[in-house]
């Protein structure tokens, strides 16, 4: 795991996430949240978030919103970000990472960063994009560093941590490829951030910032060249 791996209780700052609704499901006798999550390829956490459920209690006849389907992946990102127009930190970079492990979500990584790595602000990244393991496939989770417009902790470079938005895709892309929904979410999020941030931004992956001798992040199977084609340097 790289400066790219995190986990954690995010302290006073709640995570926000959004996976576009795939429709609804009516609870039947014998259903459990974990069973419904498995059936629809999402997570219990995502079902709780979408439906405002605090525990595991569901009742026959309840109509649940299902995360992870088609639609606008950026609804919650826009809702959180639009009020910040004119008051954004001076961002100059957008940096893509992989988590380096097969499962996880922003809460897990935030706990690790806070409690094991000792990061006072928790989650090192500004956004985490799920792979269907502990959050929805393509689900964009908004970390407290974006919500509060705080510097990142995702690379060695102080300059890039101070002025770089860190986006982590859950998975180890040395061993396999990100899912199509993860790439769709990353592309949508990166495009929106470039439009939102008033000054010019440089698109990069972790190893391009800290050097290949330091990290392989985001892995050999991450589509680095394709992402650069979509987001050519503006410097």
State what each model feature region is.
Residues 70-90, 131-134, 139-142, 146, ...:
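Basic/polar, cationic surfaces and motifs that engage anionic cell-wall
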Residues 45-52, 78-79, 107-114:
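N-terminal post-signal-peptidase region of extra-cytosolic proteins
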Residues 32-36, 93-101, 171-180:
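Second-shell loop/turn segments in exported
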Residues 21-29, 35-75:
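Extracellular LysM carbohydrate-binding repeats and other cell-envelope/extracellular binding modules
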Residues 22, 42, 53, 89-91, ...:
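Extracytoplasmic
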Residues 33-34, 44, 106-110, 183, ...:
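Extracytoplasmic/secreted envelope proteins and their assembly/folding machinery
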Residues 82-148:
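Short, conserved "active-site rim" segments that organize catalytic pockets and cofactor/ligand binding
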Residues 1-19:
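N-terminal export signals
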């Amino acid at each position: 795991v790289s400066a790219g791996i995190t986990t954690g209780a995010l302290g006073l700052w709640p995570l926000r996430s959004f996976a576009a609704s795939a429709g609804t499901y009516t609870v039947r006798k014998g259903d459990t949240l974990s069973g419904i999550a498995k059936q629809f390829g999402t997570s219990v956490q995502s079902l709780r978030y979408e439906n405002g459920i605090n525990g595991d209690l569901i009742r026959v006849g309840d109509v649940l919103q299902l995360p992870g389907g088609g639609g606008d992946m950026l609804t919650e990102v826009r809702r959180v970000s639009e009020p910040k127009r004119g008051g954004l930190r001076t961002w100059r970079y957008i940096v893509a990472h992989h988590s380096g492990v097969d499962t996880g979500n922003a809460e897990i990584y935030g706990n690790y960063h806070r409690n094991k790595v000792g990061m006072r602000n928790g989650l090192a990244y500004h956004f985490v994009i799920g792979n269907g393991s502990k959050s929805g496939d393509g689900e964009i989770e908004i970390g407290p560093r974006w919500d509060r417009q705080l510097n990142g902790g995702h690379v060695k470079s102080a300059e890039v941590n101070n002025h770089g938005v860190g986006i982590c895709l859950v998975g180890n892309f040395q061993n396999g490829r990100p899912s199509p929904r993860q790439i769709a979410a990353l592309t949508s999020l990166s495009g929106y951030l470039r439009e939102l941030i008033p000054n010019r931004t440089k698109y990069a992956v972790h190893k391009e910032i800290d050097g290949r001798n330091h990290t392989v992040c985001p892995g050999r199977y991450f589509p680095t060249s394709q992402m650069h084609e979509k987001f050519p340097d503006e410097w």
